[in-house]
């Protein structure tokens, strides 16, 4: 859909990095519009895991995770709507920071779910993450959802705590569970207060996320119609519905089509209260 497109301006995080002396090396591959968890829905091929080419880099920011692992001294930017930074960081053995919504401006970002998208960082170094987070974070008059609170980087270590939801541990792979539990004494030794809590509503998180994210995606991606945005090969001398259908059928990948259709279904008059409004209630 965006083949050959070159942005006419920099997104705010890129602008701030350049202003601080950073150099943009390139763009990394990812799932189309962020739709995926394994970077297999990319128009540019599937990125290979740095440790085992037969395994996944995660997604949707899989290329960013691989690049952060393979290129020492560099950072990579990623966008998380539902795990697209933490997933690749885990798969590629690097550190991923998914900031709180609003801490980093979304101006210039192609929206997936505009109430869920967060711009974050991946790197092999926690110090590098902290340094560059201080560069890209902060309020932006071009993004009304950005937070006015200044970044924490540079203020020294603050007392920290970790809440461990019991429900999140129920279906873990045994090896993952063992590694995670082995890290808890280390954290406690560093002064982190670890408290086990119960979050019964956690089991509704994934279905609620899918309904809300795809609903927002279906509206955000409506602009790619071949007239305002998007690649166009269809002739304009036809009925709008035929033109619109042709452009979107050819331009979007299979996963993008599935999520657009699901989001449109959830927002229809006959199903809005059953799915979309209930998901909003779960989120609140």
Ranges and model annotations:
Residues 1, 41, 45, 52, ...:
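Charged, often glycine-rich, active-site loop that binds/positions anionic groups
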Residues 1-13:
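Enzymes and membrane/adaptor proteins characterized by extended Gly/Ser/Thr/Asp/Glu-rich
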Residues 10-12, 172-198, 229-231, 241, ...:
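Acyltransferase
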Residues 15-136:
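Short glycine/serine-rich loop segments
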Residues 22, 99-102, 121-127, 134-142, ...:
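Generic secondary-structure signature for well-ordered alpha-helical cores
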Residues 95-183, 239-246:
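A short helix-breaking turn/cap at a secondary-structure junction
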Residues 144, 149, 159-166, 197-210, ...:
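Flexible, acidic loop-helix segments that line cofactor/substrate-binding pockets
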Residues 156-163, 215-284:
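Short helix-loop capping/hinge segments that flank enzyme active sites or metal/cofactor-binding pockets
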């Amino acid at each position: 859909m965006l083949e050959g497109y070159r942005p006419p301006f920099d997104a705010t995080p890129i602008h701030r990095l350049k202003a601080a002396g950073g150099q943009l090396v390139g763009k990394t591959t990812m799932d189309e519009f962020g739709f995926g968890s394994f970077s297999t829905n990319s128009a540019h091929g599937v990125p290979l895991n740095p440790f085992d080419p037969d395994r996944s880099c995660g997604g949707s920011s899989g290329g960013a995770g691989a690049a952060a692992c393979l290129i020492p001294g560099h950072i990579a930017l990623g966008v998380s709507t539902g795990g697209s930074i933490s997933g690749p960081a885990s798969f590629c053995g690097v550190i991923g920071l998914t900031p709180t919504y609003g801490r980093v401006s979304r101006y210039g970002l192609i929206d997936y779910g505009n109430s869920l998208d967060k711009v974050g960082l991946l790197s092999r170094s926690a110090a590098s993450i902290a340094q560059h987070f201080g560069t890209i974070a902060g309020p932006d008059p071009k993004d009304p959802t950005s937070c006015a609170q200044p970044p924490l980087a540079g203020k020294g270590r603050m007392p920290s705590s970790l809440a461990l939801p019991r429900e999140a541990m129920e279906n873990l792979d045994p090896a993952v569970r063992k590694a995670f539990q082995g890290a808890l004494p280390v954290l406690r030794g560093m002064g982190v207060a670890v408290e086990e809590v119960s979050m019964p509503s956690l089991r509704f998180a994934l279905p609620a996320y899918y309904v809300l994210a795809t609903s927002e995606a279906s509206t955000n991606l409506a602009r790619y119609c071949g007239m305002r945005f998007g690649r166009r090969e269809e002739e304009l001398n036809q009925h709008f519905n035929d033109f619109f259908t042709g452009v979107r059928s050819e331009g979007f990948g299979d996963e993008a089509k599935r999520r657009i259709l699901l989001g449109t279904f959830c927002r229809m008059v006959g199903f809005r209260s059953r799915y979309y409004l209930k998901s909003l209630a779960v989120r609140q």
